[in-house]
Amino acid sequence: MFAKINHLAICTTNYAANARFYQALFGMKASNTQRPARAAPVGDGQVGLNNIPLRDGRRSGLDHFGFEVESIPLALERMKKFDPNLPAVQRPAVRPNAAWSAADHDMIIYDLAERDSGKAQDIFAENTGGELPRRYINHIALRATNPERSAEFYSTVYELPISNDRSGGSYRLSDGRVTLLILPWKMENFVGHDPEPPRLEHFGFKVESIEAVKRDLEEIAGTNPVMVTKPLGLGAEGKARLAVLKQCPIGQLQLTDLEGVHIDVNDH
């Protein structure tokens, strides 16, 4: 395929512990090249999940995602043809895993890396696909003001086919392994809790068993009190936030990581 989703980034003060959480619960792998003072990336064979130290003035939580593409010049050409006003900037050479950063019409940020460029480092060079692991990232979810236009954009520019499944008013596009789920952004979703702009909302894992994940989550928290996730659905606002997360037609069990990033899992 022309493009595949290869990158997610979380900004967190607990970047090292958060990376260990994803290793412990979901079996993600750390890079063979460790850089203790830098971000802590882990991978599932395709997606590199980068846990980034939170800097001043930056918002914590799920930050952006990224594509690996056959040709960055062609992707940029298609993007400008689709909408000349869409922004894209070339990144400094010190960030080899994200040659360019761009945004869709809702200003949802994503990175671009070119396949076989020889520039990938750390987990992004070590993610080589192969046999599906027992637990792996199988969808990322965006909230968009115009889901149909967003789906058209990602399909036209990145050749992600659009599924006929429109459950929950969503659009599903796939690179063959990871689904890009585009959900409608509605102000009505925020009547009971603080409003959020259109954004990268959550991501989810395909697992072998929901019950096994529940058992592992309890065992991990009992073994290591640092790895206790944020509570979901507590209080009126918590219930309202959880109700929005449950609008995802793929997720069956909802939880968070140590930073409070929303995750869901499915075994169907």
Regions found by a protein language model. Give the residues of each.
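N-terminal beta-strand motif that seeds the catalytic metal site of vicinal oxygen chelate
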Residues: 1-19, 62-65, 115-151, 179, ...
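Vicinal oxygen chelate
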Residues: 4-13, 41, 55-133, 172, 218-268, ...
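Short strand-connecting beta-turns/loops that link adjacent beta-strands
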Residues: 15, 35, 94-95, 147, ...
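Conserved active-site tyrosine of GNAT-family acetyltransferases
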Residues: 18-23, 79, 107, 150-155, ...
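Conserved acetyl-CoA-binding loop of GNAT-fold acetyltransferases
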Residues: 24-31, 83-86, 156-163, 221-224
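Conserved short beta-strand elements that form part of the metal-binding/catalytic scaffold
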Residues: 26-61, 102, 109-117, 161-197, ...
